[in-house]
Amino acid sequence: ESAGKGKKKTALIVGIIIAVLVVALVAGFGVWWFILRDSDTQSAQTQSTSQQSGKTKSGDSKAAKDDKPCTAAPDAELGSVDHSDANLVAQLQLTSNCASTKDGDTAEFKESDVKVSIKDDEGNVIASAVFDFSKQPVKFNGETANVALEFTTRQYWRPYDQIETGSAEVILQTGQSGTGEAGSADGDALAGSDIDSEDAERYAQLALSWQLKHDESAASRFYTTYTTQLSSKKNGMKADGKTWHYVDIYEQFLQQRIKHKNAILIWSGDYPTYTKADASTAYYVILSGDTVDSVKAGDAWCKSNGYGAADCAVVDLQ
């Protein structure tokens, strides 16, 4: 009987121990689950906060990007050309290459030191100068804008009415250096400073060659009739108190052509009237292109246009 009571007592103790262990395990699991859930919640909250913070930064970054100054040069097309006295006025149609601002507007283009060059369909540079758009920022209507640029007679190398606008190419380059000061332009046009003198000389020399070829047919009619000669110059020639270079020679041609719409350029070595006196003659000659019936009529033309005997002579090309 004592042995039976001992077994019952032992079983009771074991049961109590097992119950305590079960309670401890349940309590431990509850604590572990609570801690894990809290950790996951905090992690999710942290991740959500991080994502929200990332969106804010992205939005701020975009706004900051949109509000940056427009430094990319716009694309350009040549709309039309005209003249102001002897200067060339080019109307350009610009298309912005910059993003819109956060207000939905296209950022203004107001870079300084922007070289604008116009080329013909053969790739010849026929106008080039450096403009400061900070003085007259380009304001876009949507993504486009129209601007007027004025080129002096030392900045363009093609008579304004011989420029083919439909086939011309316009190139804008930022970060370029000009020489001298920009002059004043008429109306709303913006004036620019000169490009490098060596580049200008090269463009002027090419322009003289182009002009000679272009004017050949117009010159041919003066084999049989008279016209008036207004200038004869060569590169390196000393006259009128200065040394003449290609830019000077072409500038004089442009100025004379504004005064006399029929003015043409010829090469003295191509025509008998000059080679008879000097077989090695090599001058760029400006003719008024106006027809006169006689030497006397030509002299009268010179006088009526304000030229003295040293500046105007009656010639034919035979």
Annotate the PLM regions.
Residues E1, K5, T10-Q318:
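Acidic/polar low-complexity segments and flexible, solvent-exposed patches
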